[in-house]
Curated annotation (Swiss-Prot):
PANTHER family: GOLGI APPARATUS MEMBRANE PROTEIN TVP38, GOLGI APPARATUS MEMBRANE PROTEIN TVP38-RELATED. It is found in: Golgi apparatus membrane. It comes from Eremothecium gossypii (strain ATCC 10895 / CBS 109.51 / FGSC 9923 / NRRL Y-1056). GO terms for biological process: mitotic spindle elongation; vesicle-mediated transport. It holds the Pfam family VTT_dom. This is Golgi apparatus membrane protein TVP38. Residues 1-71, 135-143, 249-262 are lumenal.
Amino acid sequence: MADHYEARTSSQGALNVDRRTSISNENFFDIEEEDFLDMYPLSARQRLIYQCKRSSRKLLNTFMDLPLWKRAAVLLLCGGATVSALVMMVFHKSILERMIKISNELRSWWYTPFIFFLLIFFVSFPPLIGFSMLCTSAGLVYGVSFKGWLIISLGTVLGSIAAFSVFKTVFRSYAERLIRLNDKFEALASILQDHNSYWIIALLRLCPFPYSLTNGAIAGVYGISIRNFSIAQVLTTPKLFMYLFIGSRLKNLGESSSTATKLFDILSILFAIIALTATASILYYKTKERYLELQRRNQDRFDTLNF
């Protein structure tokens, strides 16, 4: 009897040690992730180096965890992007001239607005891509104008509503799978469930998630109404002027022969991209904070149940 009790106590102790060790390891990684920079007096340069190394390790680990065919696809895409960048650097003048010629031709066609509208409408459905490129192309054709904004706004709003409706009613199971594709999508879903308002949806639409996938993922969140989603889409249309601005600066870059004007156009494009990235990053980190909070809450609940 005593031997049985000692064995049971020993096994329970081992389990408790394992559990404490597991939690300790998890807490260690949480500290390393969130509090490392606050624990040590690092300079700005050291902080930047640390962040770059940590991001590189995460990226490499994520890449190595992919199946072989996905790794090959990633390498192929990176190679294609590198070749495209080199071609753009070498033949940038002729490419810009060709782009300007095509944009002027498109502007003269009466049916060009319908082409842009339909293309933007259809890329709203996951897993299609090309939204940013199409909006920037509209800026090349129409510049920063009400006409250009109206075309891409109608395509964006109506396309997103259509994709949301289809995935909410017909492809609901696929929409729920989209949420589970990424931890950040799950955090997004949690935020929407807690705060079902068009303001929150509008803010989350500015996060750096793929445009079409976000339409499908939001449709998988219970309680989100088409009304609130539609209002949120309308509220986020002013940001589309940024794409038009970038497209118009690209066109000016090809048309201008002045070095000062070209420099101004390049700086304007960089500023616009930085502004978009900064806004998206702020909202992204807010979403990440929410995700970490949920993780801590789940861990506390798990500890309570095991206790």
